[in-house]
């Protein structure tokens, strides 16, 4: 299993923030759903920080673990094909399993 770091930019206008909420769609939710669908495994991203409803980001960092054999550097291009226009994965790379975006 490898750990992948994503740098994510988004226009938060239509979202209830980063963190999954019961009252509306969030950036984290969209990423989890699209990554899980793409890799056909349960993917849960962990973000460096949370943003509130309506807040934008040019480079929020998140990680996820996966069994995929796809090179991590190609994930950003591949996943952007299925993300809405207001969420873009700017970069993706493999990081050490000990890497955590908050610490």
List each model region and its residues.
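Structured-RNA-binding interfaces characteristic of tRNA pseudouridine synthases
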Residues: 1-103
């Amino acid at each position: 299993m490898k750990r992948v770091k994503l740098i994510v930019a988004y226009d938060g206008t239509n979202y209830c923030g980063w963190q999954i909420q019961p009252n509306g769609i969030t950036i984290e939710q969209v990423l989890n759903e699209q990554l899980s669908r793409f890799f056909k495994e349960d993917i849960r991203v962990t973000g460096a920080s949370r943003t509130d409803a309506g807040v934008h980001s040019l480079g929020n960092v998140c990680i996820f673990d996966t069994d995929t054999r796809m090179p991590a550097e190609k994930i950003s291009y591949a996943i952007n094909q299925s993300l809405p226009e207001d969420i873009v994965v700017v970069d993706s790379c493999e990081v050490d399993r000990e890497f955590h975006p908050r610490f």
